[in-house]
């Protein structure tokens, strides 16, 4: 089967994670992974991003499938349940809004820039080598540290579930997938 350009988007996901090690401001590019799925689901009413363009899902598929890093076990029913998915979405939103709050505090001068990446919302990893100051306000860097934390945490969770279950198990409870699914359901209700 002939490969299409979007079959290589896993390279973009991997490159994004690598760039964040060298310059945290590249974390801003992750917003594309946030807005593009929403735009596609709002405009087209489909989960086209998840099914075709998600580089992270592709990366998990390659690592777990082609490289055999997955047990390929079925994901537990509770992880597929709407309660878990919606609960995880709410939890993710709370962590996202906390990140925005901290960014706002840095912009307001009420808090110093925290040059750390917080993994799994708990473990603060020093990341000072990835930021050397810029012409931008430190709040721009604070957002980058926070957003990279969210992206790295979701990647770690995806890798863990990839190893334990099927390669793309993360996709079952991915907050972006849950949001786009809700948008698609709402759009389909409008059509009726």
Regions found by a protein language model. Name each.
Residues 1-192:
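Non-ligating segments of multi-cofactor redox enzymes
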